[in-house]
Amino acid sequence: ATVGKSFIYKNSIGKAIYAGYLIRFQFNREHILPCYAYSITSSVKYKEWVEMHKGRTAQPNINGQQYSSFKIPVPPIDVQKQIVEEIGKIEKSNNDAKSLIDKNLSDISIIINGLGSTVSIKEYFDINTLTLNPTSCWKDEFFTYVDIDSVGKGDGNISFDKKILGKDAPSRARRVAEDKTVIVSTVRPYLKGFAYIDSVPEKTIFSTGFALLKSKNEENYISKLLYYLFMFSDNLMKQMETAMPKAAYPSINKEDIDNFKIPLLTIDEQKHIVAQIEALELEITKARTLIDNAASEKQAILYKYL
């Protein structure tokens, strides 16, 4: 998984010893700047070369002799310096974005973990109220199926890309979600397979591996706050861990969730907390977009000069 991955050593790091499975490259600085050579390893050409030359084994690898065949474009030193400078700006923005994400996630955790836990979930939320069997309702039609793999681990992302013909629906495809529903994976919940759905796409069915939690009244308890509690509350995670049996596939059930304790807050307090966290999440989303675009921006710089 790490074959072709690169790292540049700088004197500021201090003395270092590298592992025997790594290869060190030293360059004639009159012709190639090390930082420039390092920037080439972020190029599409380099990544394609790695894919072509890595061994098709359980532990893919590329040896030193193979690396010696990789051709590096060598522009004038002043052009190399310009490339390094421009890519350096992108990397700085990238690092700043990562720091912002870490800070905002920490801030969200502090907000959530500053709340108490005094009331049972069942007092304010209904769980798994709607079901549907797509094999009979949509026998010859396609529907969207959300299974455990469709929900990200710890990021709240959810994919609606899986389309299945009704007659081919798995037996676990039964749960129906309404708008403003909290999705909780009941298997290995410590992986945080949780999500919040503000608006559910038509003809969407969820696996019975999820618990679907819907506020009895959004004016009493905001569903999105419950999602944030599942995602960030240390206390709620401890309750889940306590409820899980010591088995190969530790899980929680509806009765467990019914009795988990959550904070009892006024609706104004809830709205304030949700607004705070949404603002922090918006910054996180922008930072992640910047990080996602970094590779293509670096490539654009290389295309511009090489």
Where are the model-predicted features located?
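A structural connector/turn signal
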Residues: S12, T57, L165, S171-R172, ...
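Short amphipathic beta-strand starts and helix->beta connectors
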Residues: I8-K10, H53-R56, Y196-D198, T242-K246
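Periplasmic-binding protein-like
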Residues: Y46-V50, N235-M240
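Short, positively charged
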Residues: S39, M52, Y228, E241-A243
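A short beta-sheet element
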Residues: A1-S42, A173-R175, D179, I183-S233
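Low-complexity, Lys/Gly-biased intrinsically disordered segments
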Residues: V3, S117-G156, I164, D168-A173, ...
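Non-catalytic DNA-recognition/assembly elements of restriction-modification systems
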Residues: S69-S136, F142, N259, L264-V274, ...
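A short glycine-rich beta-alpha junction/loop motif
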Residues: K15-I23, G55-D78, Y190, T204-A211, ...
